[in-house]
């Protein structure tokens, strides 16, 4: 999932050593959020999708985070006291851990009271990510990057028990509050990995107490507390009464200053007492709940777009009169349909190209995205170095005549001899419609598709275990670098890593490996562009679109903006309770 900047950025998010007191009065402020997929659990090492990442980010924290009000996106300290000191050779990173930070209260601790966070907690948490028995879904992020960590992982691959106390050369707590990383090579994106949920701090006592049930007993250091997670349609978080002193930013980029985002400057976080997350899979019930004031913000469903947004891309008067605001922001993402390259069938590039040419992405943009998205020519979205402006993929459909020729060249004239292909997608009306559209498009050239819908956690599991043939999905940036998109096609990242399709091209892999250790430069961008062209010409996916976010928010919701990095956002949001009472009376 998402973006980056300089190593020595300074934080305008003010963080001190004191914590909130339990005597602090509740304000009655509740943030109401609706999500469109089931939440699979609350274990950071499995938070590989937008939904679980956002939930994990309410409870857990990492060394670094993105400054909430600065663009370009800028890394700043979070549980780290400051940005790290970095050796001249770019291999050793030394962090000072913020003192006085407490884990949430839990039965796993003596007397049920949360203990202080120390550097060793990060050593343990990152070893969990590397643990071969656990198969953490974010291992691709650190694979081959920390000295001795791969060897530690390989040593225990065939043993019954993993020794977390064994010292790893490149991952050490050199003092109670001092954490040291030694890298195998310089990796420019390394710091971004420390702002991702995969590397967030967990307490060993809690993991060992709950074992396999740990994902249902989240205990972090974050702004909100959730004693027990249950697979229900509603999850309720409460303000962490022992949260450290962390204040709303006092600095912002000009666009946010002008929009009034500094009204809460200097206030203690979080600004609300509760966060209620409702799982509402279908778009129309989500929409109706938003209109009733039961949900504070929402992406506009496709079926309601024309009533909410004018042809000039402005909010219609009906909604303006209700105090609703419209935000339009480009998203660093790509939607796509992936082939399972483990199957011999899809190792045939002409079959992949034929299916790509049969797919009318322009029409799908009209049908499912209200013609607001940009058809994707390859994997890297606009706004990131490595995207090639004005580039047109040679296999961007629709071109039915050429698709039929390539299908015949692949050995399946008019689809003869080709087995029925299963297309897996998430549950929900729109996802099903997209699946049916795929079926109809492929039928034009004689390719038979069977659509199978899955609850989101089940689809994730099937992709991870490579139990799919063809599947529809989207990827949102973890950080703002083309490497984060190109790694989706890097062979060594095959599932359970981020490369769910299992695409493995030696030339692409070689270029990726070279670029991954290069600093930002024209030379690195040239390699990114070369990989982007390979990704278009080899058609490892059927490319969809780069989306644009059209988000509505109620006037009583403060400090909200659509962002590529939502993890931790809830702590900055505020509710004007008096205004909410007035507004909801009229809804």
Feature map (PLM): residue ranges:
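N-terminal lobe/hinge region of extracytoplasmic solute-binding protein
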Residues: 35-88, 219
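Extracellular/periplasmic solute-recognition and catalytic clefts
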Residues: 227-238, 263-264, 276-342, 366
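A structural "hinge/loop" feature
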Residues: 37-55, 79, 107-111, 137-138, ...
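Gly/Pro-rich hinge or "lid" segments in bacterial periplasmic/extracellular proteins
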Residues: 68-70, 150-178, 182-276, 284-285, ...
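C-terminal motif of bacterial Sec signal peptides marking the signal peptidase cleavage site
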Residues: 16-19
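Structural transition elements
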Residues: 224, 346, 374-410, 427-433
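Aromatic- and charge-enriched surface segment that lines or borders ligand/interaction sites
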Residues: 81-141, 180, 286-289, 345-347
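Detector for C-terminal structural segments
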Residues: 26, 185-188, 218-219, 230-235, ...
